[in-house]
Amino acid sequence: MIAVDVPSKSLLLQHTDPLTLRSLLKHSKVLDHEQYNLAVRHSLEATKVLRNLGVAAPAPIKYHYRWPGKFKPGAHQIVMAEFLTLHRRGFNLSEMGTEKTAAALWAADWLMENKHIRKVLIVAPLSTLERVWLSEIFAVLMHRRAGIVHGSREYRLDMLRMDMDFYIINPTGLAIDSVRKAITARGDIDLVIVDEASTYCNASTRQYSALAKLLQPQQ
């Protein structure tokens, strides 16, 4: 049995071996309660540990996030955001029109809000940089700063020197060596969102090589 206590941001559990769980989980304590025998801080780390142990702990974002923006998230978007916050890498293969963009931005915002990441790079088709991504950031994350890294080489490098929360670039721009190196040199971009994964289905392209070098700098 598991429940969420929202005011205290805690998970309440009834488990057969609460002492062992307590030894594995930081910020937890055994309870003398008729329904629950363990309280755990509802953090991302605790949720992952519990899930690895077979306990169906919900993602913290579902209960401890204000979901900012002009509209409320749909149930499917909450599921998307939960998945994205719980996994270091993943694909969202939902159909068109399911508002994947907003779900990804909410997930990124929650991760920033809770100090799991610092800044985000969005790699997306040129036609979507402003019309889709920048527009959606303004719609759902009005408190965040975002900039489009497009134009001359010098302009791109200047944009990357600016203090933004989201840097939005197209695959061709990422393939410019000096631009990619400037992104890596920042040292504070901890999350990369890649739009249109089909762009990278051919490993022999410059776009694929550039993204691989960014995600695996040792190559």
Please provide the spans of the model-predicted regions.
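The Walker A (P-loop) glycine that initiates the GxxxxGKT/S ATP-binding motif of P-loop NTPases
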Residues: 94
